[in-house]
């Protein structure tokens, strides 16, 4: 509450946290709103949007008011695939309209690098800027739970959280 007051307080009568109602988001968004109410003393309402397509349209057309949930599944295993599409100025998935010239420059420099270690170092610098600016609030990350037996050795999980069936064998 002290930090909120220091930042100028909350302007408005309530916070709205929107989610697509055609998936399992109601429970955690309501829990998040309850936490906001209890911690900050600010009214918060979790509001479902009928389906994902409508939800994404409202976000894309900048009709969404207040907070909204989002998520990202990497297309390929690289830090770049989390930074550029979501946070680069003008990127199609930059739903929060984040813009930082230094961040964009670091992304460009990282992409131009021919050395993977140097490229990753630039991406990590850009990531540090995101941590300082905090344009979105990471709530959690997904995880995959798998099980197997001694009769099925060598099971490997891909970077996408699925079984690499080429690694599976039977004893």
Locate each region found by the language model.
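Soluble non-cytosolic domains of exported or imported proteins
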Residues: 22-30, 49-53, 97-101, 113-120
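Periplasmic binding protein-like
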Residues: 35-87, 122
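Append "and occasionally in soluble cytosolic enzymes with long acidic Gly/Pro-rich linkers
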Residues: 1-34, 38, 125, 169
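Short, solvent-exposed loop/beta-turn-alpha elements that line the ligand-binding surface or hinge
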Residues: 57-63, 84-112, 141-171
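Ligand-binding clefts/hinges and TM-proximal coupling segments of bilobed small-molecule sensing domains
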Residues: 112, 118-141
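Solvent-exposed loop/turn segments at secondary-structure junctions
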Residues: 21-25, 52-53, 73-77, 128-129, ...
């Amino acid at each position: 509450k002290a930090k909120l007051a220091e930042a100028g307080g909350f302007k408005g009568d309530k916070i709205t946290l929107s989610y697509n109602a055609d998936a399992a988001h109601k429970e955690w968004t309501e829990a998040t709103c309850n936490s906001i109410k209890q911690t900050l003393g600010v009214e918060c309402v979790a509001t479902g949007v009928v389906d994902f397509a409508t939800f994404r349209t409202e976000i894309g057309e900048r009709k969404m008011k207040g907070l909204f949930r989002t998520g990202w599944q990497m297309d390929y295993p690289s830090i770049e695939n989390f930074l550029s599409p979501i946070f680069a100025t003008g990127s199609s998935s930059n739903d929060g309209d984040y813009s930082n010239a230094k961040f964009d420059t670091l992304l460009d420099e990282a992409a131009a690098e021919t050395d993977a270690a140097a490229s990753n170092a630039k991406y990590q610098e850009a990531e540090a800027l995101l941590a300082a600016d905090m344009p979105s609030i990471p709530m959690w990350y997904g995880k995959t739970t798998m099980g197997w037996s001694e009769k099925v050795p060598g099971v490997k999980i891909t970077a996408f959280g699925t079984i690499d069936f080429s690694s599976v064998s039977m004893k």
